[in-house]
Amino acid sequence: LGQSGCGKTTLLRLTGGLETADSGEIRWESAHKTAFVFQEPRLMPWLTVWENVVFGLSKKETDPGKIEAVGLSGLEKAYPSQLSGGMKQRTAIARALAYEPDFIMMDEPFAALDYFTREQMQKELLRVQQERSASILFVTHSIDEALILGSQIAVIEKGMVKALYEVKAPQEERNLLEDEMITLKRDIINNLHFI
């Protein structure tokens, strides 16, 4: 979590091996089946929604439920040029979920989505995380989104982790109007120097 330009995306790209660090190292405890969702959907324009989602998977690994889970049923044969920005992003999310990863890296994946679709995607992400015990490194500039989705929230400023917060309430019981959430949000805002 952090303001624009603070190093959130760079951290994600370093963790995913898309960039190399100037110093230090990132270690993995074991091999992970990893998926990446970028800020901008990276779809192949010559493939349909369905073909983009199942690209690289064997026939037995394909699950039409992933398209349904992101609210794109009926658009399987559509091409990216026929989709809105939010629909393209949901296609990219479905592709990541179809891979059934153990580790998902997501760079502001819900930023282009309307409120209702964002809420639906947050619930689906939590379901996948609980069902698969998947670890998720989620980059956002939304404090509310971090509080709803995160178990640990790292506040980044100028490329450094400035503060680390643990959200103790079970995810299915989280309410942004509860005292714990209000207190955490206030602490995070104070750490980000918004006030």
What label would you give each PLM region?
Residues 16:
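Helix-to-loop junction immediately C-terminal to a conserved catalytic motif
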